[in-house]
Design a protein with these regions (language model features):
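A composition/biophysics-driven feature that prefers long, compositionally simple stretches
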Residues: 1-169
Length: 172
């Protein structure tokens, strides 16, 4: 039997095929392009999305937390969901982009997975209206060089402009 120190902190699992998402690949790319423009304007190399609505909006994956944290990290070139091992391969199948699964074997594996995906950067955009004070402190304790900038209002402004696909779904 493996000891706790031999068990992985996080891993990737691409099992099965990608499931149909609520929107087309072009729609997710449109959203990510707009977010990346915001990132560029603010000098951010990454955004850490933690709310259910923004993770779903940018990745297509709607999580149920089961008391565990979830995220979507958008970088200049990628979109990666961070999910708990309890969901195994489902987040990868049900999201646009990549997925990294963290395990419960050791405390703070979620933050280790987040730090693994974040690029070498000193500034990351966050949802200040969703990330708790405890989570911000944990993020800072595991990466002392990382500064967080609240972009929650900017993200909400981006989401206010609806695409044709969004309007079509709303009218159903």
């Amino acid at each position: 039997m493996n000891t706790v120190s031999q068990r992985p902190e996080f891993f990737e699992l691409h099992n099965g095929s990608k499931s149909p998402l609520p929107f087309s690949s072009a729609e997710y790319e449109r959203r990510l392009t707009a977010l990346r423009q915001l990132m560029s304007d603010k000098g951010l190399r990454a955004v850490l999305l933690t709310s259910m609505h923004n993770v779903a909006y940018y990745s297509g994956f709607l999580y149920c937390s089961f008391g565990r944290p979830y995220a979507c990290i958008v970088t200049e070139t990628g979109c990666t969901t961070i999910s708990a091992n309890i969901d195994l391969g489902q987040p990868w199948r049900r999201s646009y982009g990549d997925n990294l699964i963290y395990t419960d074997w050791k405390r703070d594996n979620y933050w280790r997975a987040v730090n693994h995906v974040l690029p070498e950067t000193d500034l990351v955009g966050i949802e200040g209206d969703h990330l708790t004070l405890a989570a911000r402190q944990k993020m800072a304790s595991l990466n002392s060089n990382l500064q967080a900038e609240d972009i929650s209002n900017d993200i909400m402004t981006l989401r206010m402009i609806k695409s044709a696909e969004e309007l079509s779904l709303i009218h159903i």
